[in-house]
Structures are given as structure tokens and as C-alpha cells.
């Protein structure tokens, strides 16, 4: 997926697939499920059960920006489903974004 793509699931239900840029990998995707409360599936860009892991295909300098994009997709009231661990809120994603920026020496 390059950019964003809307997937029609039928029955009037659609989801948005979004390439949020490199971070955990070179091609991180998120899925936004619109609803009364937005739900964003984050993959391993967000990890609740421990510190996010950066493997050899990670792009640390861009990871915080990918999390900013996740927050833009879902908004302040969304629920974020991480690749590992329990569902989190926007405050958790922001805190993880700031921790990764500090860890990898990335400024705003």
C-alpha cells in the first residue's frame, strides 16, 4: 500500500489501510476502523507489553514520525491495538513516541 487505501468489507463497512512510513520496518502499515470510537491496528509500531524492539530492518530516525501519523489517523479518543499487549489510548502512543525519540536521538 502506497499512501492510503480504503477497503470495502461489504455491508457498508470500510476500513482504511495507511502506510504510515518507515519505523519498526521500512514499510509499516496501520488499519483504521472507523466507528463511534476509532480503532487503529498499529502492528509492532506500538508495543504495550514491553519496550518496542528495533530489528535490523527498523528505521529508528523515522519511527517517531510514524507514531505521529498513527495519532493523526485515530485521534485523541481512538483506541490503539498494538502488535503486542493490551489495547492502549493516544496518551500511551504519545508517551511511547517521546521515549523512542529520546532513545534514538530524534528531535521534533
For each predicted feature, which ranges?
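Proteins with a high burden of low-complexity, intrinsically disordered sequence enriched in S/T/G/P/A and R
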Residues: 2, 63, 107-108
Amino acid at each position: 500500500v502506497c499512501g492510503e487505501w480504503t477497503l470495502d468489507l461489504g455491508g457498508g463497512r470500510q476500513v482504511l489501510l495507511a502506510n504510515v512510513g518507515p519505523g519498526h520496518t521500512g514499510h509499516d502499515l496501520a488499519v483504521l476502523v472507523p466507528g463511534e470510537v476509532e480503532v487503529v491496528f498499529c502492528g509492532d509500531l506500538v508495543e504495550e507489553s514491553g519496550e518496542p524492539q528495533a530489528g535490523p530492518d527498523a528505521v529508528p530516525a523515522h519511527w517517531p514520525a510514524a507514531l505521529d501519523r498513527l495519532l493523526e489517523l485515530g485521534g485523541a479518543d481512538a483506541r490503539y491495538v498494538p502488535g503486542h499487549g493490551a489495547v492502549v489510548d493516544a496518551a500511551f502512543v504519545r508517551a511511547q513516541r517521546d521515549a523512542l525519540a529520546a532513545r534514538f536521538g530524534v528531535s521534533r
